[in-house]
Amino acid sequence: MSLAPSPLVGETPLHAVEVRILGCLIEKQLTTPETYPLTLNAVQLACNQKTSREPLMQLETGEVGRYLRSLEGRKLVHLVMGSRADRWEQRCDKQLELVKPQTVLLGLLMLRGPQTLNELLTRSNRMHDFDDVDEVQHQLERLIARGLAVLLPRQSGQREDRYMHLLGEPADLESLLLSRPASRGDASAPSEDRLVELEARIAALEERLARLEGAQ
């Protein structure tokens, strides 16, 4: 499948690190508003988080700072000057004219790659209260209509449709598509639900730790 980046991000698609940064800023804005906007160190920690991230990354501070400045040039993030530390906030919702449900879904797709409706519904519950999968699908269809996301054709063995963002470089998008497991049958559904629940609990603990570190 040929994947074309969204024209809404300009002539140059987003680098994989830029995609990760935006996804992290969206997530932390909604799950830990008391520590948002984020310092450079907090952005780095969020990018390198071991849960709720696909693929895992190990980014250096300088690398994160460089791509934050690149995103600032695109008006997708904004630097908030502070007396103790400078902080970063995302502006892609305003720049791309997104409502909150769309921002949440796009953020999840940036953090986790291709996902099913049920995965998105479960993983979004700490950021937005969707009524059901139909509402998730409706908002995804609006993103698709604007060229920000795509419905992927089912591969062999897959039981559910998957959706993916279109903000990244073609090679990165193809890599995301190929990196996902080819099959998740109905028999594995209970264990997948349990895994998602455990991921949410671990993420909540990590956010509590981040709040404690931010208060020091």
Swiss-Prot record:
It comes from the Bacteria. InterPro entries: DUF480, WH-like_DNA-bd_sf, WH_DNA-bd_sf. Belongs to the UPF0502 family. This is UPF0502 protein Pmen_2627. It comes from Ectopseudomonas mendocina (strain ymp). The lineage of its organism: Bacteria, Pseudomonadati, Pseudomonadota, Gammaproteobacteria, Pseudomonadales.
